[in-house]
Amino acid sequence: MYIFDGAMGTMLQAVGLEEGYCPELFNVERPEVVKNIHAQYLQHGSDVITTNTFGACGLKLEDYDLQDRVKEINIAAVKVAKEAIAEFKPSARVAGSMGPTGRFLQPLGNMSFDSIYDTYREQAEALIEGGVDFIIIETIIDVQEMRAALLASLDAREAAGKTKEDVQIICQFSFSEDGRTITGTPPEVATTIVEAMGADIIGINCSLGPEQITPLIEKIASVTNLPIICQPNAGMPQLINKQTVFPLSAEDMGPLMIPIVDAGASYVGGCCGTTPAHIQSISDAVKAHTPKERAHIEPKTVITSRTKLIELGHNVKPLIIGERINPTGRKVLAQELRDGSFIRVKRDALDQVEAGADILDVNMGVAGMDQTPLMEKAIFELSMLVETPLSIDTLDPKAMEVALKNYPGRALINSVNGEEESITHVMPLAKRYGAALLCLPICSGDLPEKAEDRVALAESIVNRAYGYGLQPHDLLLDPLVLTLASGEDSARQTLSTLRLYKEKFGFPTVMGLSNISFGMPQRPYLNGQFLTMALASGLTTPIMNPLNYAAKKAFVSSTTLLGWDPGSAEFIKEYGYEDETTAPGNAAPKGPDKASFDSNDPLANIRACVEQGEKEAIIDLVKKALADGIDPLDITKKGLSEAMNVVGDKFGSGKLFLPQVMLAAETMQAAFNTIKEIIPASDSLDKGTVVVATVKGDIHDLGKNIVAALLENNGYKIVDLGKDVEPEVIVQAIKDNKAALVGICSLMTTTMPQIDNTIAAIRAAGLKTKVMVGGAVVSQDYADQAGADIYAKDGIAAVNHANDFFETLK
């Protein structure tokens, strides 16, 4: 059991951290203050102290015009920590802190993966040069930012000639009360992604108190054997006598850490509001406690999206990989991709998911086109649109890397073969980006006909994968499907290969279904029969068209007969009421939650576009609706606004997450822009003016930016004053813009009192403007005590409150 320290910001605030002063500059200008804080933690039980470098990456230091001093500040911080250790506890170790940049990566934001990687790489190199024992990437709310920071840390460690025995890399996420990060990632998904990429220790810090975090630690422990770290807040902050107070006393916090230790954490400490006294209490409690023995987790083959994890294998129900996002043999799709349109790609994705696809295969191989930008665009679009994990289907190493880099999850690579060029290009990418890898038994153009030869070649590919550091649970096998036209024995050999794979390796198996019938008549019938036999022979994951009625029915029937459909519930749901005399087509079934594009009602089609994030398609629909004489206000109220209400409800119930909400909002904005282009006088579409700002002293604006974007995309004129804004500036902006509503936020507990000051300044100016407040550390109670009119817990709540308020002004 290792005890980390507590909050640095809380302690700096106690010794007089001034608003507008960079906390990390203490390492250079007032090192004795930082050393004294470290000393207090060491004297109160800390085995590991964390450097005062939470905001010391270049992108954060830009806020203080200190971006050219990254190396100096970080090395100074490590030096101060080491001096404290040498004097007060020589056995202790140093963790180099790297906090969030405050930016979202594309497509949620405008930062590229490489730019975020570069800023973390610079900081990690400085911390390692200084001599840290750990890199601790903490308080991260977006898995893409964590992936960039983790890769940067791994690369910096390797470049310095260090190993994990020298410098361990810790990944700590922050989760909201709903058990997910702000961008929708649950603990088990976050853990799976970073473990596959090479994290050494995984856990949670900030955002919640011990009692709320305990079940989240249990979820992490359910999917990994890696060490777990937990550093909760001292409860959620409260406003008492205009001072920010964390409710958990030191005496209360220690015992509350016992369930966290029993859940699996072996590294514990504190975050916001915790002091040396809290750490002493935690140390006393956990070191006197004998933790429960942690269950060993057998590794499983899993892939994820940003929000969803699925397991593949012989011990779980077979899954479908949808094959439709592939321009091969699809002239219309190929031409649309040449034209830069992804409308059909997105509709294919939605239709396949609705029809039962568990994974979506993504192939951007258009003849004469560079796959790399097409693949990047596809990954951006699909990762925002659907929860379904993706399979990256390309032979182009550049396209493969850009897809893996920008995919916010653990993808499946389709595929690697036995050729040296394929192995040396693909396997390092799978290892680097934590992807699962499909192995195809082909080498030098040779297509082994016999099952035994395929198995032998597959074994050689598997052994090469082990040499690159991949593990058995990272690998899947393709039995190789040759068309019946190539020989009457081809189907039998594929089925034999499946059986041998299961017997020898036990890995999940994946194969393209439609290859078997190429060049044959009655293809759907042959495909369905072959699928049934393949599933019975050990196929776990067919690549198929789930919209094809015959293939889908064969799949559901087979899984029912093989015992994967308890009570035949899925079969009855799909086919129990079917008229056996009819010959159904290949259309995707329309479920009750599926917005339809086929309605004769133009407003219904517009609503469907918003709900499904069809920001390209909605332009033509709005143009047609206007041409047909539909009033712009009806388009806005009965089309766009109603759709966003549905999106908001789904967000509130956990059916949609921030990426999907942002995409829907962008679609709505595209519609507004189209209306205004065609009817410039449509000023009545502007709902009102809202001033937004982050309060004085707070340099964090990520949450404010989300709220501003959602409000703007919902038809409001936004006056964004930025971050660290003086109350007087906010007051003047309200006057200048005649704003009826102002939104102010604070992320830092140290700047929460500025919410009170800003509201007081607005009231003193005699303004009747309604004040809406929010932020990670703000609660309803805090908002009430501060005198706010509205508390918005998130961006959707802000939009709903704004809609309700402006409706009262009409």
Please identify what each model-predicted range represents.
Residues 1-476, 482-810:
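Domain-level signal for soluble alpha/beta catalytic cores
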